[in-house]
Amino acid sequence: MQEYHIHNLDCPDCASKLERDLNELDYVKKAQINFSTSKLFLDTSDFEKVKAFIKQNEPHLSLSFKEATEKPLSFTPLIITIMVFLGAILILHLNPSPLIEKAMFFVLALVYLVSGKDVILGAFRGLRKGQFFDENALMLIATIAAFFVGAYEESVSIMVFYSAGEFLQKLAVSRSKKSLKALVDVAPNLAYLKKGDELVSVAPEDLRVNDIVVVKVGEKVPVDGVVVKGESLLDERALSGESMPVNVSENSKVLGGSLNLKAVLEIQVEKMYKDSSIAKVVDLVQQATNEKSETEKFITKFSRYYTPSVLFIALMIAVLPPLFSMGSFDEWIYRGLVALMVSCPCALVISVPLGYFGGVGAASRKGILMKGVHVLEVLTQAKSIAFDKTGTLTKGVFKVTDIVPQNGHSKEEVLHYASCSQLLSTHPIALSIQKACEEMLKDDKHQHDIKNYEEVSGMGVKAQCHTDLIIAGNEKMLDQFHIAHSPSKENGTIVHVAFNQTYVGYIVISDEIKDDAIECLRDLKVQGIENFCILSGDRKSATESIAQTLGCEYHASLLPEEKTSVFKTFKERYKAPAIFVGDGINDAPTLASADVGIGMGKGSELSKQSADIVITNDSLNSLVKVLAIAKKTKSIIWQNILFALGIKAVFIVLGLMGVASLWEAVFGDVGVTLLALANSMRAMRA
């Protein structure tokens, strides 16, 4: 579907009606409007006809491919209108002479027309299309009817305060939209393309693969690429949530959206902007807010019946009692108008999507990206969670946990020999040994003269350090060189070490459990998760050790299809939605089959594509945060629904009893909408 920006769309109910009208057109396959971001997603065979339809039915709206600069809303006209209105009322009551009454009548009529301009025009547009239940038409009918029953001061006051409420509603919506735009603004706006000795300013979208771009200090990398010249530090916080800068030099891969902190870089473009990391982050957030939750779908359908129902009730209040001699028509029409004032479903229609929008926005600022708002609803119902082990519950970073010397050698010697043999290796196991050697022995690797270095695939390394031959690897490596050695029973990866054909001992290397893993599971229990399980392709001993530490059940040595099958059984056992958290390629099928699949940001691209939620900062505590956000968002939305319906029901009853006035009924409509909007904004701070 093609994406368009809709300008001047400031009414949520109008957005729903326009979406419905567009979907009824023969030449439109699908139309979807995101009121929160003012975007139209359109699949049509005739775009010009769509434009003409919108121009005819909503002439104040316009479409464009690019977002227009938003004009700031001005309080001045509103304040002047209110001041003139209050001044006229004050003069009228202080000096109620016939001349003053006539003069103030014309002033109030002018105030009515000025403040109600949008309502009056909108009402006539709606009536022309046969939309008799349009909120503008109902407001116009209510104020005119109030005028004819002698309540012309209240008629004008309703229009003034309704318009004031609409203005404040626009302001609140505008601010919420800016919150999303603040997230989108992490994407770079410009790129400096190198053409010979010149730099040309272009949009990142216009860059092509193999182009060379120059990124100065303080600027953002426009697209994913590789450094061809220069060395610097990059801040990748916008992509991963990590605050630690990353050092890059020639041949280093860099991500679009990263901030250059230290020196000028020349980067060769590897991906088009639409395929870059930052574009995917922005797209994920926007796609999430485009989707409608089940609650929102229900409210949209409910609102279509709500307005006619309230209008019917108001009509019955106005007509039936006088027919049975229970009072005058003027009295009961006035009471019916009070009920009519609360017929607009705006508080419901706008607060639900903005509540979810706030939840998605709050999550994104914490490094949690959602692919749809439906996951917020499902998360609140989940009772079970299963984890992959390596890279999810563990750091995926190897660490020396034990050194076992043999044949009279010391731990220090075993570690020193192993480190010497692996100085030229970049394998994670080799790096963990080098790190341990630096920490324990303060060994200076630059003093070692390494010769004849050889990596034996799947087994280990062989290297000559000065005049000594060192071999480090698994049992197969030692067997190949006919070196006798002792068997090991420890859990983890074993690196055997031989020095000049003599076995000196072995090193145990284990993956570390994440620092926040235990705390995460404890906090998840507080959030209502009752059942925990580890599903791993690793061997039983390694998985069992982690499971015992965390206190949860486990299944080990699983193939990808077995992992999916075991997860399905785990989920069915507890008869409630279940979450799966993983990061590897073998996790993708299970992530896709889970009620909510959560992919860790440093995992494989396939796992992130299969997940409903991507945690960019790789922190397990983000699981706790996203559950808390989901629950708070749901709570806020249902507060809005119950509050709006409750207040409106109260005013219908008060109108029937003749207790409430039209002034007070304005609060039942506009006031409730504003309070619901303000409450929805709390989700942004979840």
Swiss-Prot record:
Residues 1-62 form the HMA domain. Residues 93-102, 152-154, 328-332, 658-665 are extracellular. Co(2+) binds at C11, C14. Changing V504I: In strain: 69A. Zn(2+) binds at C11, C14. It catalyses: Zn(2+)(in) + ATP + H2O = Zn(2+)(out) + ADP + phosphate + H(+); Cd(2+)(in) + ATP + H2O = Cd(2+)(out) + ADP + phosphate + H(+). Mg(2+) binds at D583, D587. It is found in: Cell membrane. Keywords: ATP-binding, Cadmium, Cell membrane, Cobalt, Magnesium, Membrane, Metal-binding, Nucleotide-binding, Phosphoprotein, Translocase, Transmembrane, Transmembrane helix, Zinc. CDD domains: HMA, P-type_ATPase-Cd_Zn_Co_like. Disulfide bonds: none annotated. Its EC number is 7.2.2.12, 7.2.2.21. GO terms for molecular function: ATP binding; ATP hydrolysis activity; cadmium ion transmembrane transporter activity; metal ion binding; P-type cadmium transporter activity; P-type zinc transporter activity. GO terms for cellular component: membrane; plasma membrane. Changing I80V: In strain: 69A. It comes from the Bacteria. It is a multi-pass membrane protein. Couples the hydrolysis of ATP with the transport of cadmium, zinc and cobalt out of the cell. This ion efflux may influence the activity of urease, which is essential for the survival of the bacterium in the gastric environment. NCBIfam families: ATPase-IB2_Cd (TIGR01512), ATPase-IB_hvy (TIGR01525), ATPase_P-type (TIGR01494). This is Cadmium, zinc and cobalt-transporting ATPase. It comes from Helicobacter pylori (strain ATCC 700392 / 26695) (Campylobacter pylori).
